[in-house]
Amino acid sequence: MAKSDLIHVQVEGNVFEGKSDELAKFLENGGKAVDSQGHADLWQWSISSDNKLIINEIFRSNEAWLGHIKGWFQQNGDEVFKMCGFERVQVCGPVSDDMKEMAKEMPFPFELYDHLHDGRFGKLK
């Protein structure tokens, strides 16, 4: 796949890479709940000046955020990533120890980052 066929998706610090046409289809329901459990209260998307697709998600709580991320580790939870042709995924936010272990089993490069005390994100080993 040529690099020009990819666009970046940023979700409050998270970065996804995927095929732009598939991502556009995925985002057609923008403004509704992020997932079927409604873990996020709101999401919206736009194209930035440097041609990146920006997604913002607002969660009710850390528990809602964790529920959203844990959904990726369920059976067939990675289907959206495979559908979009993602080459890598970076997830930034509070994560649990079991998520760190599950991320190692994902069928594509999946990196977890956590908040550092100074507000930056640091990669989890």
Language-model features, listed with the residues they occupy:
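Short S/T/G/P-rich N-terminal loop/turn motif that feeds into the first structured element of a domain
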Residues: 1-53, 60-70, 74, 82-125
